[in-house]
Amino acid sequence: PEGKTRSLSDLKGKIVLIDFWASWCRPCRMENPNVVKAYDKFKDAKFKKAKGFEIFSVSLDRNKTDWVRAIESDNLKWDNHVSDLKFWQSEAARIYNVNGIPATFLIDEEGTIIAKNLRGGTLESTLEKLTE
């Protein structure tokens, strides 16, 4: 939201959850507490191969104020929040073939997608298997 460029490649070597969402998406907002819980639990965890865990949130919002307000209201405290404010025409959504949200992709330390659309306790249990 601060206007800085964020790149997924900066997180190589870590487990990354790419989370496509939007402030106007009720199912996304209902899932956010589970994402926050997983972040809190695994942000400092030791992983078998990876050097940590990060979340890369990609918003499909059009309105920056609504997007920023939702980040604050849902307590999405990680650093990596991006949006081109292009709604469904988002370049990232096109690249990942996202046509419904919430949509998540779990990426390993090599940059390979290892799981998709993890929700609720499934996200935590999947991350648990990757820890030492």
What are these regions (language model features)?
Residues 36-39, 64, 68, 124-127:
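Extracytoplasmic/secreted envelope proteins and their assembly/folding machinery
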